[in-house]
């Protein structure tokens, strides 16, 4: 309309939109706009516009599993079948007469033959502590094209870069391309990591559920649980266990005190309920097989779906899994090869061959391997104990 | 100086009115009681006698709640065959532990001449020491003889001195003298022809009231020396016991009884509807309320009425789950204070009340309202009529009432229902923000909860205000006095005690509604030890020493 | 030790002709050639039990009454059909209250059990008739009676002596097993038997306990004296247990010690848990009877205002009976009806367990009389009149079975009186005020 006052342009009131509004409505409009201007100018100072209070979400990670794509019969991803356990590999090396003798005509359980299968280095070395001293048939690796995970190196085709080694990429089951998950390639056809075997990762998850100490993720500076542009994300380790209901599910709303000397911080953003974080190097502790271990993940980043009610979350931790960290766990659980069906020398060889991150400056060989781990979490109160005053505070404005 | 004098005069007056006896109305007393030990008392007595590491593994028959208290039910409780079987089993197990190699050095005061034969002298020393403690009074000579005989025969039969002791001890643990706390009377020197509680029964009454256990050595000695028959001697013991940390146990036992915590044993919550209500939550809920009570009433010498408004409590890890609050020490107990505007205020809003008085899968305004009335206001709600027609509730036009308030509308409008439900539902409806497991909620089936109510003409909004209403209601404190006195004497007050009860209520008010002071008032009174005259209760002649009339 | 027990030595009592009566254990050598009676001509011992469920049936869905004494089971009671020939079904017996309140889920069953209407919850005005029966026939067994519940709550017992105390029910299968078949159990089929000298010592200790207690009881008032009487009864039962431990028990053909239920067997008010608990408890109870541990038993399938619920449902059975709308098409409350059917299925489990035990020429059920009863005719209205009752088992041939008996409005106590007479009690009148009766249900008495 011509002659519209300047201050009426650009103010969408919604009253009589698109029609010629009656005079009293127009007058009303003018009043409302005038009022708005007065408020904005601070003349009516008792009407203040306070910034929305920032909120915090505390999460405890309840389970950690390799994000492993598998089909029920395994044929798509493992056309050559699953890997053989070290005991089977060893037995295959024997002549039929030797095999018959050592198994006492097949009556002895292979778990009992475990020590023979382990200590078969040329000088009797344990081949999980010294995997390079023997040459075993190679690891059966994933041949399929699909995997969960994230594009870690930023390339489309996995070509070598100053920080990565050349490797093949995957496509997610939903069709997202450029996925780096060499770790899956290495162990995706090993029984112990797959759902049916579930051994190597279900043991630590079981320990966690039975009162173990979880890793905590504290997200602060949240404007809105669905969308927040800049949040702080801290990783802690707790000294308190999780509480289960009678069906074995972890309950939300527990309180967790943070352990001293374990802290990693980064930034992130929440878009449509999904939190993504800026990569940093993180050591993730866990307890399994009667010992403390850790997964050292370089360039670790989260991609977490936050439930709208703020009670749970699920998603991925992706990054480059440091091979030394991996092997220091494997060499101590070597004896599980009979039930998890892995062969240490073959596994060691494959994971080094297929590693694609952080090349050694001297040798050029990659020392970390791209990986994706699926995690689940429930919400809880993260308790910070101030050593000086022994006061405890829980972050204000908990999200619910 | 004048101020001091004024206070001093006021104090003296108060003392004169409420502490000195002459101002105290007479009580005719009730019949002598014979009260079965509660499970808690049994366990505590064994621990006091033989040490905390003696295991008591067995189960105890439940007591019937009578006139609001299990302790009054204890005065009527019998011992059934199956209960006796259990007492026998427990007795043998306890006795076996007492004499075993780990314990006999400490618990048997002498060594026998031979381990595999009777030794009358050592057996006598053992039973002479343990007998009076077990029976809570001196052992009669013939009883001691009998015990030495029985254990001697046993020892000879199984060629084991200690086993012989254990047989005798086990027998003692299943006699009525042990299992029941009985009122023994003796002739009253101040009232010829009348009877009074004897000193040892006084000691037992006092000890079970204040500490929920048998009299300790000092109290037994006071009984023996006749101190408990004098006001001064009695007050000295009462003050000693009130100052002891063992008072906590007595106060906890009373409130545990009054609040009906025995029903926690069979409390079940549907694990699908309330997955978070696990066993550790149920256990901690009771503990939370009992600690709230002892913190306020004993440690802080607070006003009883503040139990219904206080926001100060304690939290444990499992409770933090249900209350949805941070707990700074999840593996223990921490003080916790709810914010000033929080609906959680007072013990009625704690889990031990709202979760206990609910159904397994939903809340219940009626159960909660009834519980407030019966527990805290001592008002008996009549039983529901037998022939009630529920067709009114089952309105076929609205088969799914969205909120409890809507569902209970018929309760309050139908004439046959309204009379009773009017006095229950409005209180309970104020607590509807707490679901069947005690968790806070603002909506039920997507409809916002309206937590307004009215009690005896007083309107209020929400749980915290309900607490204030109970705080301010004069019946609340007289109910507590009534209950505590009934707990103390094992019977409801009798008709002739009207003035005495009024006196107690006035004293409670004078002392700022402090429970330890009320306990002192009761424990040092004549009324607490008064026994109805012989002939009123039974026709049997009193025995010369230590028999009940 | 006596190798072959002669009838005479047992009759005289192994304790050398003492005054203690020893119940006759059932030996095959005592049976007549037909296995239907003792060689002396006396009938086989009859066992008595009660089985209680809360909240009745859905009216019109329990039985169809036919001509004469014929009847058929309907939907609620379908599971009982295989046992119809053992069951008498009583309808139209009423509960006059003489002005006492109809205390919901209380008056209904106590009137017929105690012969008296209670005046308040927790008031048990006189002994329930199972106690009168067990006092008469149960003294010589290891247990005078056994009370069990499937609900997990020891207060769910309807057996009481009338002093205001009830006989607590056993809620835990593991504890029940330990009590029955644990260290104190004497296996009747074990070849060797050595009386434990320690038992004799315990007997002398109990004797001293009784002496002690007698002087204690001497000075009590009358109300407390009644409680002491119960104490002495309990001590006597313990003495009886010890007596039995001093003799080799007679072999019991059907006695097979069952496996122990796990210590962590779930107990609770979720309906399927309760059904399972009931099944386990039934097995233990039946074996206890088959092993001659008791002659009287009481099973509470549920509390009277049954708190059972389907998992995930927020309403209990009791709440549903009041709040569930009557389905317009079906004409009844569907979920409440579902619970009634589940109750009867469990009753069938109970009855079947007795029917599976062979005894003489027939089964243990043939030598039992079980009183199956409930607290209301129509739970929705707490209706007191026409509360359904059943007798199950042939009582050793002393009663006729398979009949429907119409009460014509007579008091429920007629059934209790009949049962006491069948069990051999010398009682010709029972109950107070309008519940007083001297008319047994002669139609079922042989």
Residue ranges of each PLM-predicted region?
Chain A
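Bacterial N-terminal signal peptides that target proteins for export
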Residues: 16-32
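Bacterial N-terminal signal peptides
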Residues: 30-42
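Sec/Tat signal peptide C-region and signal peptidase I cleavage site
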Residues: 45-49
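Extracytosolic secretory-pathway proteins
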Residues: 50-400
